[in-house]
Amino acid sequence: MAQSVPPASSHGQLTVGEVGTSVNSVPYARHEEIIRAPLTYLLNLPGKDVRSKMIAAFNQWLKIPEDKLDVIKRIIMLLHNASLLLDDIQDSSKLRRGLPVSHSIFGIAQTINAANYAFFLAQQELPKLGDARAFEIFTEELLHLHRGQGMDIYWRDASICPTEEEYFTMVSNKTGGLFRLAVKLMQLASESDKDYVPLVNVLGVIFQIRDDYLNLQSGNYAKNKGFGEDLTEGKFSFPIIHSIRSNPANIQLSSILKQRTTDIDVKLFAVGYIESTGSFEHCRRKLVELTAEARAIMENIADGRSEDLESYACILLSKLILYNRLTYKVPAAQVIHGASGGYSTAPKPRILAQQIATVRAPHLQYAT
């Protein structure tokens, strides 16, 4: 879904002495177009717009004015896409939503600059909310976001497998940060005295675990970002953490992560191993558990009004969480024990072969 950033004006001209003092010029407008190009490219790629849908869902409770709601949506959209630009560089990603990543087109330096520019474009929107506390909340959550990203990168680059507790802290900072920022800004503009942050914290963790699961299990995800991209990145995702820690003596999976492999057969081996340790099933169980927790929080928010609960549960759970669709899994691997006490895995090929066919011969629809 194409989105837009606040436009630059294109009227008038500047003298040399006026440079930097006005945005009402043709050169300024052209320069803006150049500076924002990596961001604009990303915004024009088709997406699910999950965060805007989440904001709209929460606004059924918070009921803030439309003008302020639009400002908050713009802030979150800018920050989210800025973080994606940087993520793709930091993760050496090749695809985003099925098309080349921005830095493959515009270069790393220009893409970093566009991402940083977007952070400040978002900050520039804050005064429109009319509450000085917005800047403090904005700063706090961006610090959380960078702390989470920093630890995620550190574990990957140092080949250190975190505990699940450390993972949840990282996710709360990194993924939950923008969810939390949106809801906190909305609460500033709302007359409601209820705190929705506990709910959004749970939703952030659900969203990330689901994303980690789909990265290794979804054919559609493979088409859009590449099959098993987390394995190529060397990322300690939720199923990978569980799999490694389920049998620390077996170093096969941790060794594969260090290789940053793009080899499909090696990735298939890794996915089969993760399945053999029950780690995908662990993801599904954790998502059911977290969804029940989210549901309990919503019941408390709804104060027993069943019609409200069902309405919001439908929006927040059915459209955003979708845990009940995570029933697809890799066919059970055939485990072959070797003389050394280790083992190799041979996943049954049918469904995984369909995934690989998608990866090796993707049908890409180019954004216009």
From Swiss-Prot:
Its cofactor is Mg(2+). GO terms for molecular function: (2E,6E)-farnesyl diphosphate synthase activity; dimethylallyltranstransferase activity; geranylgeranyl diphosphate synthase activity; metal ion binding. Diterpenoid pyrones display various biological activities and FDDP E shows anti-HIV activity. FDDP D and FDDP E show also inhibitory activity of 42-mer-amyloid beta aggregation that is involved in the pathogenesis of Alzheimer's disease. Isopentenyl diphosphate binds at K48, R51, H80, R97. It catalyses: isopentenyl diphosphate + dimethylallyl diphosphate = (2E)-geranyl diphosphate + diphosphate; isopentenyl diphosphate + (2E)-geranyl diphosphate = (2E,6E)-farnesyl diphosphate + diphosphate; isopentenyl diphosphate + (2E,6E)-farnesyl diphosphate = (2E,6E,10E)-geranylgeranyl diphosphate + diphosphate. Belongs to the FPP/GGPP synthase family. Mg(2+) 3 binds at D211. Disruption phenotype: Reduces the production of both diterpenoid pyrones FDDP D and FDDP E. GO terms for biological process: alcohol biosynthetic process; mycotoxin biosynthetic process; terpenoid biosynthetic process. Binds 3 Mg(2+) ions per subunit. It is an enzyme of class 2 (transferase). Its EC number is 2.5.1.-, 2.5.1.1, 2.5.1.29, 2.5.1.10. The keyword Transmembrane helix does not apply. The lineage of its organism: Eukaryota, Fungi, Dikarya, Ascomycota, Pezizomycotina. Pathway: Secondary metabolite biosynthesis; terpenoid biosynthesis. This is Geranylgeranyl pyrophosphate synthase dpfgD. Keywords: Magnesium, Metal-binding, Transferase. Mg(2+) 2 binds at D87, D91. Pfam families: polyprenyl_synt. It comes from Gibberella zeae (strain ATCC MYA-4620 / CBS 123657 / FGSC 9075 / NRRL 31084 / PH-1) (Wheat head blight fungus). CDD domains: Trans_IPPS_HT (cd00685). It comes from the Eukaryota. Dimethylallyl diphosphate binds at R96, K174, T175, Q208, N215, K225, K235. Mg(2+) 1 binds at D87, D91.
